[in-house]
Amino acid sequence: MAQTLSFNGRRRVRKFFGKIPEVAEMPNLIEVQKASYDQFLMVEEPKGGRPDEGLQAVFKSVFPITDFSGASMLEFVSYEFEPPKFDVDECRQRDLTYAAPLKVTLRLIVFDIDEDTGAKSIKDIKEQSVYMGDMPLMTNNGTFIVNGTERVIVSQMHRSPGVFFDHDKGKSHSSGKLLFAARVIPYRGSWLDIEFDAKDIVYARIDRRRKIPVTSLLMALGMDGEEILDTFYTKSLYKRDGEGWRIPFKPETLKGAKAITEMVDADTGEVVVEAGKKLTPRLLRQLSDKGLKALKAADDDLYGNYLAGDIVNYSTGEIYLEAGDEIDEKTLGIILANGFDEIPVLGIDHINVGAYIRNTLSADKNENRQDALFDIYRVMRPGEPPTMESAEAMFNSLFFDAERYDLSAVGRVKMNMRLDLTVEDTVRILRKDDILAVVRMLVELRDGKGEIDDIDNLGNRRVRSVGELMENQYRLGLLRMERAIKERMSSIEIDTVMPQDLINAKPAAAAVREFFGSSQLSQFMDQVNPLSEITHKRRLSALGPGGLTRERAGFEVRDVHPTHYGRICPIETPEGPNIGLINSLATFARVNKYGFIESPYRRIVDGRVTSDVLYLSAMEEAKYYVAQANAEMNADGSFVDEFVVCRHAGEVMLAPRDSMNLMDVSPKQVVSVAAALIPFLENDDANRALMGSNMQRQAVPLLRAEAPFVGTGMEPVVARDSGAAIGARRGGVVDQVDATRIVIRATEDLEAGKSGVDIYRLQKFQRSNQNTCVNQRPLVTVGDEVNRGDILADGPSTDLGDLALGRNALVAFMPWNGYNYEDSILLSERIVADDVFTSIHIEEFEVMARDTKLGPEEITRDIPNVSEEALKNLDEAGIVYIGAEVQPGDILVGKITPKGESPMTPEEKLLRAIFGEKASDVRDTSMRMPPGTYGTIVEVRVFNRHGVEKDERAMAIEREEIERLAKDRDDEQAILDRNVYGRLIEMLRGQASIAGPKGFKKGTELSNAVVSEYPRSQWWMFAVEDEKVQSELEALRGQYDESKSRLEQRFMDKVEKVQRGDEMPPGVMKMVKVFVAVKRKIQPGDKMAGRHGNKGVVSRIVPVEDMPFLEDGTHVDVVLNPLGVPSRMNVGQILETHLGWACAGMGRQIGELIDAYKANGNIEPLRKTIGDVVGDGPKAEQVQDFDDDSVLRLADQWKRGVSIATPVFDGANEADVNDMLRLAGLKDTGQSTLYDGRTGEQFDRQVTVGYIYMLKLNHLVDDKIHARSIGPYSLVTQQPLGGKAQFGGQRFGEMEVWALEAYGAAYTLQEMLTVKSDDVAGRTKVYEAIVRGDDTFEAGIPESFNVLVKEMRSLGLSVELENTKLDEAQAAQLPDAAE
């Protein structure tokens, strides 16, 4: 077969072990953030106007604003965004917020009001566009730039609005009785609770205040007692029949009861059921079929029933008995005495239907609507006397006013589902029917019908993403603004003003700023590596405003719930107090328009699994039978097994295959991105998997990234979606490449008005939020063809477009002289020498020159009392050179500050007389390197205030920046020219000309040669006969000129920005930022980890020759303790070791075949070997169709080790691992003979050796080690400060004091508690003694003792210290300490 496929070597090829084909495309991993914010902002107005959501909805809900008299009204028309002033990179550099100005068009309508009739007529309409502050924009990567730092708004999980039914689990009452309660939670507004008490009376509470009987609430809704009873109970008519009564026979109420007396048919008089017989459904059905209509009852059978209506004498209007009264001898007597022979009776039997509402009604003191309203008013506003108007207004504003109460669309949908209603989701307030339905449902629950809700079910929790959080915040800002507008409208002469004069946008802008700056959900982005960025954006937090608090959250909320399956990862959550409160979205999950998390499923039609994908939320999923993704299937999509493991209604069960409706799309849909990156996750204990997924987020990007041999296939997805690796925006040809940018001439999407050139700027040695290094390297070369989405450049922690957090290291599991005790890690010196785990960290130092009271500070090289040696790295402006090597104490930026006049010593006077003013009036406040940091200066930025003269350094930086911009412009211009003139010559070729440049003969047929005689700029002068072509030529000319001027304009704008001064904080004249790159080699004390939660600290770095070695003389790189595996149960690391060993073995074979090919030129063995490794799975590469160059490229990629992918829950099994080991020509035990590097002797047993992917974590000993002799002290206690940041001391605590006491080290102890701590006078004396060379000193009184005395005095205790001499005779009698 002809080898036709080509492979460009810019992506990593893996052998896939997965057997399950993936039907659904994995959604973009940061979709949650981007979609939510786009929906909120809606920057581009769609045709037909914006729908009512997001920002539009906020404006619509607050406007129109009318003044108090109704004489004028401010209406909202529309809003638009202007382009942002600075782009993302400029905002990062200048510490600005990346935001776009928001302009809102408002319309002010002034009315004429007729004083007599009150009729309004429009007098004047004014429309104006008003600036409403800046609205932060989201970058392409789903982050915000606030004051120059990248932040992420974490999505919040909160309880969905709607109605919830619950009980107290028998905890409230000593009898253990279940007290049921219902709660209606709106999106905003008052909560309504309806609950039972221990006596089975139903109460309502508004906003958790004092409870009132629920019947009072119903009365306030306009119902009376009889109507309430009618609503909740059925009624039957009992008729007088001779001496007894005729009762309707209702079989549904008698089910399961026992006949106490014999039951007699009222019509025939025969006994239909004997006394004591059980009434089974079958018996009741037989009685109905016989035609039994009514039963006969005696008077005493009526006792205990309740009247369903008032018993009234209609002629006199006298009420004998009221609805709800109980029937007993007395009441029955009244009824019979007044000649009533029909009684309406409530259908309460105390078994199926309880008398709760009737009892509540009889216990309720309120008789009518007014009493009920007054009662509610007193509960809500205690101490205010109610009037009917105020009580009614207050009650209506609680639940029935759209301004104050909003269920939201979600709330309404949830309520409809729970209460079986069908109300449009535009009805966002409560209705009387809703309240009645809630009470009815609650009473049914008490009667034993229905189920309570599970509040931890994901159907009852929803996600609030950026857009929604921002919407709520902006609404608050606008409401604050609304008050001010109303007041201003009333106080100002309304006829003369424009909307601009009424509006002060400060509150709205402040609300936005406050949200992004200080909300608990607006977090400093975790930017250690691309994975940590992506996980941070996909995080779901139950904390934050309107959410839970750590202390109050119980076990249930934190626990894994069956509905988490495919929606929230059960593994990835922090260890510690936040466990279970902060979660991560599962890989395939997405958030629907109501904020519920949905997971994808494949449809099953007629017992066959289709490729049709359906997204369902937890509520919808419950009714289906869902098969697992790894259920065995036949070729036609039917299930192999008769019974299939499936999930249904939150249970895992075996069910017949015919009952299946859906199937999971992929085994990894259960876990989050980080957990899906762990190979053999299925063989790890959950606790260790949790640590593994959390530690991958802390892996520092290494100097040389290397993708893992054993991956899971998720690596390219993470690298692409995180934005670390640069993907092509559209197809084209690479025109230029250097380390800082890639220029591509586009060949697709060439629309008019769009540049035909894509310039990708690469980030070079930029600092991330966590001080790790962000650096991108190009992968393409000039002339390469690229398609949309191809990887052009690798970023931090990526290798050929694959996520690469660590390095593959050769590991042996064996003890080694105790150096790997307790999870310590033993490393070979080779790892240090070859920079395997070396990383670059970039630290930023900034210094500001302020304007002080005594005069301006100055950044200069001229610093008093500093040697020339100390200034060797500074330029003439006093700023350090780029490339300078600096160490602790070196000056980075020289700065002097004026100091106040102080009395001068004679020497100073003399100096002043000789040298003039300068010597004494400034002090050195230069920026110096902090202790413990060594590095190289990689970048310096200088910022000047407007109007402050720029120094030499600032000018040089500016020139460099402008040159860079000019180069971009020139390159883009060159490509534009090449494209346009190429098209122009195509159009002119073969045309008859009618005009041309000077000296051109008319009528000549144009060809390349003819046209090329003239300079390109004159080609536009050619005119041709063909009018169609001529008009195309003119259109091309117009397009070209427009593109050219747009390019020039863009360049001028950028240059203007560079040259303009910078915005500075008040009082700052000039600011310098210095970036220092620190190279960190691995050293003892650094923390390392694998991907399976196997973490440890480097204990020693051993010379290569002392490390254990294999039979071929290869020394291992890492020695791990085998005891770290059994108790931790993370066997995944062992399988990874074996498979990595096989990969390296295969790589060695491929390397040998490459050498053979170079010798004999036969590529077929190489192609065959690679083909055998790749195999023929659903995702296998067609290596047999690769052309020769492509095979070589792939072989070159694999010669260090073959890359494989073993997806979670669908990866390599033991047999696959054995096959790979055999294929690589290795023993299938995966063990090898090792020799001791120091003695050369063979170790007793075979040792497991292989390759593990090791990470270096961001817990480096250099950042933690810290020592102090003298330093800053606390003001009050005069004790040294604590912590590395404050250059503090170590706390000598209570237990350390015990230790010294135990050793009897009295003087050491005294020194610790006085001189070394807070004895101010003593420490000065010690210093003086040391200077004198004396080593005796005396301790004084510790300052903390003085603090104690002062505290006691402030309590009013008179504490005096008396110096009394002790009598020697008395002293002799005191016990000796030594005894």
From Swiss-Prot:
- What InterPro entries does UniProt report for this protein, alphabetically? DNA-dir_RNA_pol_bsu_ext_1_sf (IPR042107), DNA-dir_RNA_pol_bsu_external_1 (IPR019462), DNA-dir_RNA_pol_su2 (IPR015712), DNA-dir_RNAP_su2_dom (IPR007120), DNA-dir_RNAP_su2_hyb_sf (IPR037033), RNA_pol_bsu_bac (IPR010243), RNA_pol_bsu_CS (IPR007121), RNA_pol_bsu_protrusion (IPR007644)
Q: GO:BP terms for this protein?
A: DNA-templated transcription
Q: Where is the signal peptide?
A: none
Key words, A-Z = DNA-directed RNA polymerase, Nucleotidyltransferase, Transcription, Transferase
EC number(s) stated in the UniProt entry for this protein: 2.7.7.6
What GO MF annotations does this protein's record show? DNA binding; DNA-directed RNA polymerase activity; ribonucleoside binding
Which one Pfam family would you cite for this protein? RNA_pol_Rpb2_1
Transferase among keywords:
yes
From what superkingdom does this record's organism come? Bacteria
* Any one annotated GO CC term: DNA-directed RNA polymerase complex
Keyword Nucleotidyltransferase attributed: yes
Q: What reaction is this protein's catalytic activity? A: RNA(n) + a ribonucleoside 5'-triphosphate = RNA(n+1) + diphosphate
What's its job? Answer: DNA-dependent RNA polymerase catalyzes the transcription of DNA into RNA using the four ribonucleoside triphosphates as substrates.
Self-association state and partner proteins as the record states? The RNAP catalytic core consists of 2 alpha, 1 beta, 1 beta' and 1 omega subunit. When a sigma factor is associated with the core the holoenzyme is formed, which can initiate transcription.
- Say which family it is in: Belongs to the RNA polymerase beta chain family.
The record ties this protein, via NCBIfam families, to:
PRK00405.1, rpoB
The protein depicted here goes by the name DNA-directed RNA polymerase subunit beta
